[in-house]
A protein has these predicted regions:
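Subtilisin-like serine protease catalytic core
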Residues: 122, 234-274, 280-335, 346, ...
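Beta-strand/beta-sandwich contexts
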Residues: 19-54, 96-125
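Surface-exposed, short loops/turns at beta-strand junctions within beta-sandwich domains
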Residues: 80-86, 176
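Protease zymogen maturation seam
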Residues: 109-125, 184-250, 258, 262-264, ...
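Extracellular S/T/G-rich loop segment that most often corresponds to the catalytic His/Ser-adjacent loop
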Residues: 255-257, 420-499, 503
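C-terminal subdomain of the subtilisin-like protease fold in secreted/lumenal serine endopeptidases
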Residues: 5, 348-353, 429-430, 501-575
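Substrate-binding/access-modulating region of protease and related hydrolase catalytic domains
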Residues: 326-427, 476-488
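Inhibitory N-terminal propeptides of secreted protease zymogens
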Residues: 47-49, 57, 64-71, 90, ...
Length: 575
């Protein structure tokens, strides 16, 4: 009797707690048969649901209740392929609107391993045990070959990145010895180009932990080194005055989630109007998370002393930017590429990749071994083939897309393809960003000594440009540092440039960024790189052919104002 009484008391209390929780979409994933051509099933995990079904909106259309099934805090949606297309999805209930998330109708989806499907390898890294991906040679029918291989080895095809001819298999193995033996056999198939094994490792570098600067940084000064506010003022005033017909743009951010309870994102609810800056993302529960900070630099709302994001700050002059935060699944690099393929097929023009990995055994500029975000040689060889296939596909099918990637925080070299991915790839469509910080010298902003190379930033000729690496999201907040936070400054600049002149190619974007760049560091002699060279040195061709220009040989520092000015000029100049 006492237990029944306690239960009756607790039920209304739990309902009251649920009612107090804000409505949030915490997870959205394709479920069921990922390869089927029929109706798609999507599973949502939602916080703050009360009794009954919420209204589900896909774009500007509500879904019929017959397409929505609820089980506890999970909603399952069934979508007919011909009737719906990729669009933001959000919920509405009891006067509340949830955060909007992006629901893609594209075909690239992979599975993450469960806790019982991973093991420790000889390098001490967590590796997937029974889930691998195969890259099929391009002249073969990928799905047919993957199914043939699966049938031959008793495996099952469970996921795919179809445009790249990549298919995920679940292997009938129980330990790493069996897995590695089967990988060797599958890799020897004539139709298989590579086998991709997923691994993960803890982040022990700068971005894996909150850093406290001594003395604390001044956020305005850090971004002033890249002329952040000057660029905002220029776009707000010059663009309307010169009647430049700016175009809306979609930006993809490869991150897990954004905390919509953080002040910078509390205003993003429900539908987003035309001409506004929109953020579509799953809800996280950490305001200091990597995804929240990276997205905040792009599109966070400012206030109460906290800096706002660049795209949001453009105000009414902006044509409308859609920032889509997406990672497909927690399946490592393979999921990052699957999400990137879907985003590009959904019309994203700029991709922000604030991630990268080192091979086990990579050494920094001081000769010490890099211990953060490392992967085994087996995993790196598969990732290299996967990334190469992605950039080949991008060049062939979407040559106008720009990928902006962080150089990394191992104090190592970005361009050594045997030790660092993806920044080592040489392609016009990949911009690599290093990190700098304000120096302690009282010099003019234009001086090369106004900033100094961030000690942990990766370096060398493959780094195209550098930007401020440290952020302080709130006046009393902790400081975060790393090239991950320099990268969205460049992404935002590139997005604004393309909104001004959508005809710019990736190679032209790189050229304008470097021609407009401020400098940092000493002049170099164009010999082999040493630890002082943050980026590729400024060349005479990037300074109107002036052989005695003082910028020559120095590293490039992002100048957001001048980059936008050159983008405006490029509309009238034919090269």
């Amino acid at each position: 009797m006492l237990r029944l009484l306690v239960l009756l008391i607790c039920l209304p209390l739990s309902a009251a707690v649920a009612a107090q929780q804000p409505l949030r979409i915490q997870q959205l994933q394709r479920c069921g048969d990922l390869l089927g051509e029929g109706p798609q099933r999507w599973c949502l995990r939602v916080q703050g649901l009360e009794q009954g079904k919420p209204a589900v909106w896909l774009g500007d259309q509500p879904l019929s209740e017959t397409h929505v099934v609820r089980q506890g805090d999970t909603l399952t949606l069934t979508l007919d392929p011909p009737r719906q297309r990729s669009a933001p999805l959000w919920l509405e209930a009891r006067g509340q609107r949830s955060n909007p998330v992006w629901l893609t109708r594209q075909r690239s989806h992979v599975l993450a391993a469960g806790p019982d499907e991973v093991a420790k390898n000889m390098d001490g890294l967590t590796t997937y045990l029974n889930l691998v991906s195969v890259l099929i040679e391009e002249h073969h029918d990928g799905l047919r070959q993957a199914q043939r291989i699966a049938d031959k080895y008793g495996a099952q095809v469970v996921g795919a990145i179809a445009p790249l001819n990549v298919y995920q298999l679940r292997l009938p193995v129980h330990d790493l010895v069996q897995r590695d033996a089967m990988i060797l056999r599958i890799g020897s198939e004539t139709s298989v180009d590579a086998v991709i094994v997923e691994e993960s490792a803890p982040e022990r570098g700068e971005e894996g932990a909150v850093q406290v600067a001594k003395p604390p940084i001044d956020q305005a000064q850090e971004w002033a080194a890249n002329r952040f506010m000057d660029a905002l003022y220029y776009y707000q005033r010059r663009i309307p005055a010169s009647k430049v017909p700016v175009k809306p743009l979609r930006i993809g951010v490869i991150e897990r989630a954004v905390d919509f309870d953080a002040p910078a994102f509390m205003a993003y609810r429900g539908a987003c109007g035309a001409g506004e800056t929109c953020v579509y993302a799953r809800d996280g529960d950490q305001a200091q998370s990597h995804g929240t900070q990276v997205t905040g630099i792009l599109a966070g709302r400012g206030g109460e002393g906290a800096p706002g994001g660049f795209l949001t700050g453009l105000g009414k002059a902006a044509p409308g930017f859609e920032v889509i935060v997406e990672r497909n699944a927690d399946a490592g690099i393979t999921a990052n590429i699957a999400a990137s393929v879907n985003l590009v097929e959904d019309g994203v023009r700029v991709l922000n990749w604030s991630w990268g990995i080192h091979r086990v055994g990579a050494r920094d500029v001081r000769g010490d071994e890099v211990d953060s975000l490392v992967r085994s040689g087996l995993a790196m060889s598969g990732y290299e083939e996967l990334l190469e296939e992605f950039f080949l596909w991008l060049r062939k099918a979407h040559p106008d897309v720009v990928v902006v990637n962080s150089a990394g925080n191992g104090a190592s070299w970005s361009g050594r393809d045997e030790y660092r991915l993806p920044s080592s790839f040489i392609t016009d469509q990949l911009l690599v960003v290093g990190g700098h910080q304000r120096s302690d010298q009282a010099v003019a902003l234009e001086s090369p000594t106004h900033v100094t190379k961030r000690r942990s930033s990766n370096v060398d000729m493959r780094v195209d440009i550098s930007a401020a690496a440290c952020i302080r999201p709130a006046p009393q907040g902790r400081v975060h540092c790393g090239t991950s936070y320099a990268t969205p400054l460049v992404t935002a600049t590139v997005a604004a440039m393309l909104s001004i002149n959508p005809q710019l190619t990736p190679d032209q974007v790189r050229m304008l960024l470097r021609r407009s760049a401020l400098t940092l560091g000493p002049q170099q002699d164009f010999e082999a790189m040493d630890a002082e060279d943050l980026t590729a040195p400024i060349l005479p061709s990037e300074r109107n052919g002036q052989l005695q220009h003082p910028d020559l040989g120095r590293s490039a520092r992002l100048d957001m104002l001048r980059a936008l000015d050159l983008a405006v000029q490029s509309r009238e100049r034919v090269r």
